Structures are given as C-alpha cells and as structure tokens.
Design a protein with these regions (language model features):
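Cytosolic regulatory regions of ion transport systems
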Residues: 7-179
Length: 179
C-alpha cells in the first residue's frame, strides 16, 4: 500500500503535538467517543450534558463534565466558551436544540463550532447560523465506505473539500522496489 498524505501541509503540526481545548456538548455515543479520542490524544476536554445519567455513565472517560442545559445563555456564559479552541455540538436527536446551541456559541464568541446534522437541510441551516463545519455522519460514512468498498485499489478515502481528497491506494506491482 502506498499512503500519500498532505496533512503536514494542511494542518501544520500534525500528530496532536499541540494541545487544544475542546468543549463537547452532548455525551451520547458520538460525543463520548469524540471526547475519549481527544483526551487520549492529550487535549483538554470539558463536556456539557443535560442528563445526569449520561454524565455519570461517561465520568470514567471524560473527567470534566458540567451538568446543565446548553441552550441556557446564563449557564453557557459561565463556561467561558470563547476560551476554547473548538466547540462540538454532538447532539443529533433534536435539531432545534442543535441550532439554538450553535447560534448561542457564536453569540458567546466561540472560535470554531462544529455541529452535527442528520439531514442535508439541517446542514445548510447550521452553516448559515454559526457553524464553521457540519458533520453529517451517516452520509459521510456511507460515502467513504462506498468509495472504499466500491473500488479495488482504494483502501481508504477522506474528502477535504468537494474536489480534493486524500486516498490510500494500492501500490502497482511495477512500482515495487522503486523510490
């Protein structure tokens, strides 16, 4: 396999060597997994969860959890949203909440907001109302898997923009031993 990556040019200090601070809102499966991976990479994570039950279930993974309503401006203004490098709205079951939180994060001076959508129209609305990036997980995974399993020589694929991506491809036999 030949792995070609432009990550160093795109991301600067690649590999998680620069510690960043993340605000994760919602500790469902997606939020928990994201928080766990960020913590494992050495980043600072503060999570906000409205459900005490979910917060208790995640406390072994995410040591810093605030229990509160992320749509409440008074509550959110006490967190210091503008001090985080990024906020991730990891809620997906209630679009109105996701939209309200995204707008509130922008109003409170959040540097970069990532929100989660379950429909294309939600993605458009979030991008127009404060989200810097929108994760449409089901669509993104389906496209990635279709690309990966639909082509014999593509092992992995990450789309960077509409017409730019990073591919992990099979090495042609005639290239073996070449530099």
């Amino acid at each position: 396999r030949l792995r070609i990556s432009v990550a160093d040019k795109v991301c600067g200090d690649y590999g998680g060597r620069n510690m960043k601070s993340f605000l994760i809102i919602g500790l469902g499966r997606f939020g928990r997994h994201m928080a766990q991976k960020l913590i494992e990479a050495g980043h600072e994570v503060l999570a906000v969860e409205i459900s005490e039950e979910r917060a208790d279930a995640a406390v072994d993974i995410v040591p810093q959890i605030l229990i509160g309503d992320a749509t409440d401006e008074r509550f959110m203004s006490t967190i210091g949203v503008k001090n985080f490098d990024m906020a991730v709205v990891a809620i997906s079951e209630n679009f109105q909440q996701v939209l309200e939180i995204t707008v509130l994060l922008e109003d409170l001076g959040c540097k970069y907001t990532v929100a989660r959508a379950t429909r294309e129209v939600h993605k458009k609305l979030l991008l127009r109302n404060g989200a810097d990036h929108v994760i449409y997980a089901e669509k993104e995974i389906a496209e990635r898997l279709a690309m990966r399993y639909g082509a014999d020589n593509i092992f992995d694929y990450v789309e960077l923009t509409g017409d730019i991506g990073i591919y992990e491809i099979g090495l042609p036999i005639k290239w073996k031993g070449e530099s």
